A protein has these predicted regions:
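C-terminal cap of thioredoxin/glutaredoxin-like
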Residues: 2-5, 9-32, 36, 106, ...
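Structural alpha/beta surface segment adjacent to cysteine/selenocysteine redox centers
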Residues: 16-118
């Protein structure tokens, strides 16, 4: 089967947009998604520090268009994206929690709830009580989650995924790979991702 990896951090609005569509893309193409939670701040610190300067001093014209573009995409994807009072949010704990959800088989539901809590309901998803509420909403045991996110294994998995993305040439979230080498960045590349997945699947069928 064609390999399809989705590297993501729930603190990114553009990742929320991609996330809202990517499962349908995978179904249409007949592939499974390999979910790769990362800490996008770690990626920025390593290879894309200009993000911080752009946030602190946005170009006025480009900044106005950014707001419109995000609003247009949110409407197109039928998701609610507001202005969280805490932005950027400290996402390390919620991204560790994604691994617990992944192991429990409910990562898509957990990530969806996290995106909705932060971008739709404007909750501070760095807070333990908000993470617990998200976990409960998808049936995760809160006590197990609290212990697991402090484990060396989960911490290492988040660090490893983040370092893997950097090593493979990634610089932000969402980043997608098809068959290891073919990289795509950003929500607006999903149309290209779908075309490439279809082509890869057709090639396998004909082989």
């Amino acid at each position: 089967m064609t390999k399809f990896e989705f590297f993501f951090d729930v603190s990114s609005p553009w990742t929320y947009l991609a996330f809202s569509q990517v499962e349908d893309v995978a179904v249409r193409c007949g592939v499974e998604i390999i979910w790769k939670p990362i800490l996008v701040g770690g990626v920025f610190n390593s290879v894309n520090e200009t993000v911080y300067e752009q946030r602190a001093n946005p170009h006025p014209v480009k900044g106005r268009y950014y707001v419109k573009d995000l609003r247009d995409w949110a409407q197109f994807c039928d998701v609610k994206i507001g202005n969280p009072p805490v932005f950027p949010v400290r996402a390390v704990t919620i991204m560790r929690a994604c691994f617990v959800a992944l192991d429990a088989g409910c990562l898509p539901a957990f990530a969806k709830a996290a995106f909705e809590a932060y971008w739709g309901d404007l909750k501070d998803i760095s807070q333990p009580e908000e993470i617990a509420a998200i976990a409960q909403s998808v049936g995760l045991d809160v006590g197990h989650l609290a212990a697991a996110i402090q484990s060396d294994d989960v911490k290492a998995r988040l660090r490893d995924n983040t370092e893997e993305l950097i090593a493979r040439g990634g610089f932000g979230s969402p980043t997608m790979f098809i068959n290891e080498q073919d990289m795509y960045f950003g929500n607006d590349r999903l149309v290209l991702v779908e075309a490439a997945l279809m082509a890869a699947q057709n090639q396998k069928t004909q082989a």
